Swiss-Prot record:
Name the record gives this protein: Large ribosomal subunit protein bL9
Classification lineage: Bacteria, Pseudomonadati, Pseudomonadota, Alphaproteobacteria, Rickettsiales
Disordered as annotated region, ranges: 162-207
Alphabetical list of Pfam families matching this protein: Ribosomal_L9_C, Ribosomal_L9_N
Family: Belongs to the bacterial ribosomal protein bL9 family.
One BP term from GO: translation
Any one GO MF annotation of this record: rRNA binding
């Protein structure tokens, strides 16, 4: 195990500035990606001196991740794989496969930053998670199909889903707007009502 200082937040390891131990292979990845430096006495001293600048750099990376999130908003992935009649793949879909698909679309996301909840071994629909930043994980739909026809069907299915979701959002927005107008109307009516004076007549005493 090697000790490294995180220069930015990393899932399952910690936030920027934390000293942690990792396996040599993972340490090489972190060092190559400039996500960490070796935990030497000199680097620990530099860390203390540059703590504020490291935090600022981390915030800038978070803003860049948010911008990437916007670009990924309408994206989805389709991958063609050979499978048996029961839909079981001859192999599996790995984070490296997802990273390659994203790279083909122009997005540079390392496979270490891609994860899903279970191994993908069957044809079907899945949600893969893209860790754009320690504090920002973006879900993306993945369709695993057997052939080009399946890819066309998956594309149509996804676009239909998007249209339904957009329509549902528009309906919710319209309903909320109507409710706001009704509330505003009721409030204005109440404000227009003047206070009414109630006069109670006294009873004359018998002479």
């Amino acid at each position: 195990m090697l000790s490294v200082i995180l220069k930015e937040s990393v899932r399952n390891l910690g936030k920027a500035g934390v000293v942690t131990k990792v396996k040599p292979g993972y340490a090489r990845y972190l060092l190559a990606q400039k996500k960490a430096v070796r935990a030497t006495k000199e680097n620990l001293k530099i860390l203390e001196e540059q703590h504020i600048s490291i935090q600022q750099e981390n915030l800038e990376k978070l803003e860049a991740a948010k911008a990437l999130q916007v670009s990924l908003k309408d994206e989805f992935l389709i991958i063609i794989r050979q499978a048996a009649d029961d839909g079981k793949l001859f192999g599996s879909v790995t984070p490296k496969c997802i990273s390659k698909l994203l790279s083909d679309k122009g997005y540079n996301i390392h496979y270490h930053n891609i994860f899903f909840h279970s191994v993908i071994k069957y044809i079907g629909e899945y949600v893969v998670n893209l860790e754009l930043h320690h504090d920002l994980v973006v879900p993306m739909m993945l369709y695993v199909v057997k052939n080009d026809l399946g890819a066309m069907q998956a594309q149509k299915l996804h676009l239909d889903k998007q249209k339904k979701e957009e329509k549902a959002k528009d309906e919710v927005s319209a309903t909320e707007k109507d409710e706001e107008l009704m509330l505003s109307s009721v409030t204005n009516d109440n404000d227009g009502d003047g206070a009414k004076e109630i006069v109670v007549e006294g009873t004359e005493e018998s002479q």
